[in-house]
């Protein structure tokens, strides 16, 4: 694995792995630094650590999301070939997050130039949500259960 990090990471990877439980989302991104504003400024996730290779974030309820830069997967030719495809990443998948105010997320996303695919609305399935995408094209639906 190619690493661009020059310093010492915040904790050894096996130690961080032991802090995870349940579902953890790990997304491959072109640039960790360019990707972070969506996750921290728009979604409001807590940044635990970041460097040029990797970022660890925490959401409401202590779930985790990780970002790995493309260059960290140079040991996996199949992944590298898939990442070379110019289409949007994650096509066909939608990451749904319950517990984040969709109206606030939509406003922050628009203010920062991110694509909002579906404005905040209350849907028949019971969520008030908005649907948007990050700088890499990953699709998110964020919402709450209305009172």
Set out the residue ranges of the language-model regions:
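Vicinal oxygen chelate
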Residues: 2-24, 46-98, 104-133, 144-147
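Asparagine-centered polar/low-complexity signal
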Residues: 26, 136-138
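Helix N-cap motif at beta-to-alpha junctions
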Residues: 31-32, 100-102
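Conserved active-site tyrosine of GNAT-family acetyltransferases
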Residues: 35-40, 109, 137
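Short C-terminal beta-strand
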Residues: 139-143
